[in-house]
Amino acid sequence: MNLKNAIFGGSVTGISDRSGAYDGSIQAWLPIKDIVQGVVVTRDKRFVKILELLPVNFYTMSSMDKSAAIEDFAAYLKIAPANLQINVLTQPFDLDGYLKLLRGYLERETNEQCRLMLEESMDYVPQLVEREALTHRFFLSFSYDPSMKAPDHTPEAIAAVLNEKAEVARRYLDRCGVAVLEPEYADNFILELFYKLINKHTSQHLRLPDGVFDMLGMVHGVYDEEALKALDTAAAESAGKKKRKWFSRKEASPLSRLEAGATTIPDLIAPPDIDTHHPDYLLIDGVCHAYLYISGYGYSTVVGKGWLTPLIEAGEGVSLSFYLVKQPREKTVNAIGQTTMINRSRMRDVGDTRQDFEELGDAIGAGLYLKEGMNREGQDFYYMHTLIEVIADDPDTLEQRVTAEETLCVAS
């Protein structure tokens, strides 16, 4: 390992090519390359860990418990990865999955009264679904960065580091009252999650088969590990060789796994069709997708506890993504100090009757507030980005939902 790799992390090696795709295909459009030990590998060689959370009802907590939960989450942010993403997925209630869960409870239950309650629930829940019952799923994801310092730059080592970070997040979130789901097979969980996210229509009537990872072979039904290893080794050696001289004998290049007939991760999650030509929305698997972004001045200056609840409870077809990006402390404090000093010097030349007098005063007050929080209270500075996804089965319904969401954002 050279000095550059030791300091900056170097490049990742040993990534298997389970994502081969032809140019212009739907598979090539997808950003996902592989799934390793419950970690998503993207085409630009980023590694992302995804956790599903079971939320707590914030409004049923006492004032003391609310404050404690906020403080515990703030404590987690101090040691959390620099890039966090919180997703709130709104989708129709999964009746089949819930009834399957109740049947499992019913088989294990020995108390007759409890069995009667479970049977009543199994009869009543389908009636709720007829009234368009919705469910929310919450996810926390973070990506690998060189500061995490994996022992070596292999996908397995990076996945191990991210799984350790996930255990830390699980402990801190448990103190907040938020449980983290632990799937039995993490790779299958991630694969099924993306399949449902991308194929919103198809996934309702066509599920991935059990043991779907066994399909990732040269030819489905044929599992020759030695052939796979030899193919990967030959492809890696071919990519690493220097340019041949003009008089060298040209050897036949080895087949890629795609050309050899391999089934890949993108093959399993790719939608039947994608249309990106409309200026207002994407059409994926027959579902229209539109996206709204809240600008920097779109947030209220002062907010209370649970201030994002109206957006989360916006209704059917509306999902949210919150991106939190931690900024370096020293660099941020210096930038805030310089900006505040410049604003103070400008304040001397601005009369109190000018329109920007109050704006400069507010900017100076905000700068002093941020500096005090970071210097005296040890707080960190984060940039927050909010992306709203709106989906519908047809363009007219999509336009109505987008308009309603824009109105809700203005009112909030």
Q: What is each stretch, according to the model?
A:
Residues 2-412:
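Extended, folded cores of ATP/NTP-driven motor/assembly subunits in large transport
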